[in-house]
């Protein structure tokens, strides 16, 4: 085994291995499935008769330590350690529910005959490049394995119950005089019994799949791979030269025709109708002719295929049980699992990803029949680093851990009907972000739901209402407000949006009015920009006074419309900011603003968040912003346009916004607002109303099967969209935990919170 991953399997035979990852096939729309299937057929047709290739699917129980390392949350010796440890225990419990201890990996190994390594290397590298490009064509991630990685696969196959991790380096090999086999071999091999074998303290059995079914289905391989046990499935595939394949089939057609003639002669001699011949001959004759037609005119090739299964267990009884389970799946699809009697050693070697088949049992299949063993099922989402918990994969029961920062565009949406668990999902993410990252978190809370959670983490709740003494100034600006030399341009956009909410009717602001506002904005900031001290920060009243001084009639109309917000009963936003916004966790509670001011409040909060994002950018710090009732910002054209613009800008500035809404129709009200979807690589979709389901299916290209996960689904169930990955999820959060009481907004849980002595919003 060379460092570069090229293995000399036998004299004159060399191979390489590529690991590839899953894509969503079982959940895909039929047309997408067909496209994947056709691509897979083209992929198989790439291999000519000089290349032997092997598909390996390995399910093995891994050491849980590596998973526990990903979800481990360390104490930080602060007042939140109790909640931190409670969340960590919840993650461990969820990990135990899933199959994360069972690792499923997929490989393709390809080999060629060559006189020496110098001849083999360029050929193998060319094939490797072609395979990687073919995988890339249908969105499959793949990478070639080096020598140590290939050896590790074999070590883990031979030493399944050994807790000692694989340790190997080529430098050690030179120093010790050992060879690669010494590093991977188990303590012993025993092939005494013809039906099974022993390696170390593991017992195993190798079987082959006898393909009897007249038609195969793409679900068969997927069902084998869903088994919750140690299992290696290997498909050895050898392409037959096209001319040889056609010649072979023609000779079979000739043989069948000869047999027909013999039967017809026999019929004539016996005095009965010469058309009455054995039905099998007619059947075989028709099939052989169709096969010949496929090879000659339908882009089909002929392959020799061997499907080998290696089951392993700790004892004989357990082994017989898993072999019986495997055989049951084969039987379900009208095939048979046959034990390789007295060929267990050859079977074991054929089960290693070496690209060599030592089993003489082969079945001839066309491209389409071979491609029915589609190697794709469903994707998993389990990332390291600062990954956040999003529930369990509804198909595999594995933990879903994802880091939105790794996406090209981390902006996100949480969509769902009332009661589907939208705000709970947002609070769960906020909690997870708070305890494992250093990110700032800002919440716009139109319903007053987030108070208990924010207070539990010593966050700052800024309650904005006509009677409150907490003020934020919509005119606040800082020098970093925009990424060019003119921060006033973006601020002017914001003030235009604000004035549209205040003044604009159905048609919004007139062009003349926009010009007047823009002029006044530039004038009102002159003193502050010349000497940027807090005392010179303008307030709405300064803008109002400037509008009054303008000569145009429209400026008087604008000023009159602003008057109620400056001198009237809605003057809550005519003050300088008097609250510190330096806390890591800030919640703007705007529940008491009333209908008239709520949209305005949300817009002003959004601007305050933008100010925070611009400051944090300089400190290389991420800012997460959660906007509940997000649809309220999208109803007026100018505020929608401003929100879309901010949504686009957030990514570049280290902001990670999350819109939470039940009104999908508002999100798709115009082509411009649709940009929010296009600029959001993360969507958490919970139960959806019938009309919204159809809209989303069209917008996000969701299959009917995928839609079933957001149709009358339970609380905390749905689909997660992470980049190009779509996974059905479920989250059954332990309702006995303190965190659950802090996050839930159900009336019965509010009562439980009160019994635990946790203050609610109205108790503060």
Outline where the language-model segments fall.
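Conserved P-loop NTPase
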Residues: 700-756
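Post-Walker A helix-loop "phosphate-sensing" segment adjacent to the P-loop in P-loop NTPases
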Residues: 432-442
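Extended, folded cores of ATP/NTP-driven motor/assembly subunits in large transport
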Residues: 1-378
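P-loop NTPase motor domains
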Residues: 23, 30-49, 56, 60, ...
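Conserved lysine of the Walker
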Residues: 422
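Hydrophobic anchor at the beta1->P-loop junction of P-loop NTPases
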Residues: 414
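Hydrophobic positions on the alpha1 helix immediately C-terminal to the Walker A/P-loop
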Residues: 425
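A short helix-turn-beta junction within AAA+ P-loop NTPase domains corresponding to the substrate/partner-engaging
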Residues: 458-462, 672-685
